[in-house]
Design a protein with these regions (language model features):
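Basic/hydrophobic alpha-helical interface regions
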Residues: 1-138
Length: 139
């Protein structure tokens, strides 16, 4: 899907334009680098934050098709990009926030998931996602 077929600017340009607003959703001061927009990624995730480098990554291969969805058409693609980026900023500001907290969350989840160690990362991330999305919904 191209910008001309949707009538909107390309996803990389939207992400660049929405990045300051995404950070402002949480705080006027963050130490995050501008998002890295990846045409190719070894990860299947839509987007993620690397707490070691304080950088957000967006998988354009996964994100671009979302621009043609009902959600993008009703809210507008810019708002969808804003929500995606603000969610990732939330991983920095709220949950987990840093590597030490991420490790503590993983330890708690591991103790609750008896004999399911392979699920710890996914469950910990889902818990953080719920906290972030709940907070974003309240804004």
């Amino acid at each position: 899907m191209t910008a001309s077929s949707t009538g909107h600017q390309p996803l990389p340009a939207m992400a660049e334009a929405m990045w300051p607003r995404a950070q402002l959703v949480w705080s006027p001061i963050t130490r995050l680098h501008r998002p890295t927009l990846l045409e190719k990624s070894s990860k299947d995730a839509l987007a993620w934050i690397d707490l070691r480098t304080m950088s957000v990554h967006v998988n354009l291969r996964r994100a671009t098709p979302l621009m043609g969805t009902t959600a993008a058409r009703s809210a507008g693609p810019e708002e969808l990009v804003l929500a995606l980026l603000a969610h990732e900023v939330g991983h920095y500001v709220l949950a987990p926030g840093d590597m030490a907290t991420a490790a503590r969350i993983h330890m708690r989840v591991r103790s609750a998931l008896i004999d399911c160690d392979e699920q710890v990362g996914m469950v910990a991330n889902l818990w953080c996602d719920l906290l972030i999305n709940d907070e974003l919904q309240r804004h």
